Amino acid sequence: DLAKTAPELMGKAGALIVGEPTSNEPLLGHKGAFWLKAQANGVTAHGSMPHLGDNAIYKLARAALALEDFAFDTPAHPLMGAATLNVGTARGGININSVPDAAELTIDIRTVADQDHAHIYRCLCNKLGSHIQLSTLLDVGSVYTAPTDAWIQDVFAVCAQHLGVKPVEKTVSYFTDAAALKAPLG
């Protein structure tokens, strides 16, 4: 909370170590997490008269299929790999014999270094069209330090001395506290 409420107290840092379950292997960063909710609205009607309604689940189903083949316009990162998109949940309707007037799904996007979440949002809005409303649930940027960084080189050298082998240069797909601490620490 200090990073959010009083960033001026954090000071500047030359390096940051975040404790994560990595089997004591140093990591160079993590992917970002961009979670969205996609909502479709319709008009309810009795299930025996669907022509009097507007089925929100049909709209949402088309959106889910469009998301399945969404292509990011950012190339894969050499260590982080490619950005990913997953539809995690879908909900809609109130019962079997009604045309649903609302439906929603959640989207979990994992981004690579320097990928712009606002740009992804705009691309998804264009892809899904005006029948789908997007809202942001979580927006956590990626964190990455190049393996050529002097401090990283020192860390890898110390690890090599103690472990007998130089650590592998890698990142992880989950996000860590480093994302929250990066901005206030400079």
State what each model feature region is:
Residues V18-P21, L28, W35-G186:
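Metal-dependent amide/peptide-bond hydrolase catalytic core
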